[in-house]
C-alpha cells in the first residue's frame, strides 16, 4: 500500500510540476513577471521533478519529495494571499478573480502533496 501511495504521489508531483511550469511561463510572457521569481519557481519545479523521478525508480525519496512539496506549498501560499490582498484592496487587474482561483487550486494541490509526502516520510518504526 505504501509503494502504491508513493507512485501516486510521484505522478501527482509530475503533473503539478508540468502544469505549474507552463503556468509560470504563461504568466511571465503575458504579464512580465519579475525574473528572479520565475527562476525560483523553475527551481522548485526542477526539485519536484527530481523527487518524482526518484520515487518512481524506487522507494526512499519521500524526504526529498516532502521538501520539494513544502517549497511549492510556501510559494503558492505566498502568491495566493498576495492575490487575495490585491483583490480586497481593489488594486487588482480585471482578471484577478480568475488568478485567485488558479492560485487557490495550486495552493490546495501543493497542500495535498505536502501533506501526503509528510505522512509518508513519518517514521513508522518504533524507537529503540
Residue map of PLM features:
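Alpha-helical transmembrane segments of multi-pass integral membrane proteins
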Residues: 8-20, 70-78, 105-113
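Loop-to-transmembrane helix junctions at the membrane interface
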Residues: 51-75
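Interfacial non-cytosolic loop connecting adjacent transmembrane helices
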Residues: 25-38, 76-104
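Alpha-helical membrane-associated segments of multi-pass integral membrane proteins
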Residues: 91-125
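Alpha-helical transmembrane segments in multipass membrane proteins, preferentially the mid-helix core
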Residues: 46-55, 113-118
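Juxtamembrane loop-transmembrane helix junctions in multi-pass integral membrane proteins
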Residues: 1-8, 29-35, 56-63, 91-94
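Hydrophobic transmembrane helix segments
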Residues: 9-46, 77
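Cytosolic juxtamembrane helix and N-cap/initiation of the first transmembrane helix
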Residues: 1-17, 116-128
Amino acid at each position: 500500500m505504501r509503494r502504491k501511495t508513493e507512485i501516486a504521489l510521484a505522478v501527482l508531483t509530475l503533473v503539478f510540476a508540468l502544469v505549474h511550469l507552463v503556468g509560470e511561463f504563461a504568466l511571465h510572457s503575458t504579464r512580465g513577471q519579475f525574473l528572479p521569481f520565475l527562476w525560483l519557481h523553475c527551481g522548485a519545479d526542477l526539485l519536484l521533478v527530481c523527487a518524482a523521478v526518484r520515487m518512481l525508480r524506487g522507494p526512499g525519496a519521500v524526504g526529498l519529495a516532502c521538501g520539494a512539496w513544502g517549497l511549492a506549498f510556501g510559494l503558492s501560499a505566498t502568491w495566493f494571499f498576495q492575490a487575495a490582498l490585491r483583490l480586497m484592496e481593489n488594486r487588482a487587474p480585471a482578471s484577478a478573480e480568475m488568478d485567485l482561483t488558479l492560485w487557490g487550486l495550486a495552493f490546495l494541490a501543493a497542500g495535498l502533496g505536502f501533506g501526503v509526502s509528510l505522512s509518508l516520510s513519518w517514521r513508522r518504526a518504533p524507537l529503540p
